[in-house]
């Protein structure tokens, strides 16, 4: 009889403890998520390839270049020079080129700031680990048809407190509020997509190719050009 009573007591104690664990675990998880987002919002750029263009807003001389608006992503894409033409005109943008022969500053075609009045963020990933700390953001002309997409990037912050530091820090923090969880190291499919107005500087990523299996982007929404908006310096959510 004593053994039965002891067994019942132990069973009840284990069951009671198990009921407490999920609530405690959830609290820790939420704290970690918030702490992680706060850390991610202030990460410094840790890449090597063309650091200055990636971490600064396009300028015409000493002034920020004028902004041209486009009604949608398609309207911007049709204005971009073909990848092959850019690599032919600027040999430093070819994939085989090694440092220090990369263009340190923006080429003339990259000195363009653009505003897309309507596009959808459909996927994103974080370049952590050995990456440069950027967020790769795939934007689409449509929330359901991913035939026209482009890579845009929320840059890691400049190493020095430059003129654009606060702007890039603020857009990085805003980007992290668009979903409950921060993007992981692989492309996450955002459901539903985030409808936004997006503003940033054009950038030709000669380091990569486009459209093939190992090129940037998820298989279901893979950009067909290495043209990017990099950095994004303003985001306005529309939904």
Map each language-model feature to its residues.
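OB-fold and OB-like single-stranded nucleic-acid-recognition modules
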Residues: 24-239
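Bacterial N-terminal signal peptides that target proteins for export
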Residues: 1-9
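Bacterial N-terminal signal peptides
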Residues: 8-19
């Amino acid at each position: 009889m004593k053994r039965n009573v002891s067994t019942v007591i132990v069973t009840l104690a284990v069951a009671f403890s198990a009921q407490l664990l999920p609530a405690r675990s959830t609290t820790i998880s939420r704290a970690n998520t918030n702490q992680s987002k706060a850390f991610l919002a202030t990460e410094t750029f840790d890449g090597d390839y063309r650091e200055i263009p990636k971490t600064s807003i396009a300028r015409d001389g000493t002034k920020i270049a004028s902004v041209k608006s486009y009604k949608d992503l398609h309207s911007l894409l049709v204005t971009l020079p073909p990848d092959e033409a850019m690599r032919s005109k600027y040999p430093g943008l070819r994939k085989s080129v090694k440092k220090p022969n990369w263009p340190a500053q923006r080429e003339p075609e990259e000195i363009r700031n653009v505003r897309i009045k309507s596009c959808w963020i459909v996927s994103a990933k974080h370049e952590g680990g050995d990456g440069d700390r950027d967020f790769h953001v795939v934007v689409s002309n449509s929330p359901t048809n991913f035939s026209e997409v482009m890579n845009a990037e929320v840059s890691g912050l400049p190493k020095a407190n430059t003129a654009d530091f606060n702007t890039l820090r603020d857009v990085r923090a805003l980007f992290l509020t668009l979903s409950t969880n921060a993007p992981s190291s692989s492309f996450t499919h955002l459901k539903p997509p985030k409808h936004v107005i997006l503003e940033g500087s054009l950038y030709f990523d000669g380091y990569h190719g486009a459209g093939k299996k190992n090129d940037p982007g998820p298989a279901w929404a893979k950009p067909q050009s290495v043209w990017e908006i990099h950095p994004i310096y303003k985001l306005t959510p529309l939904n």
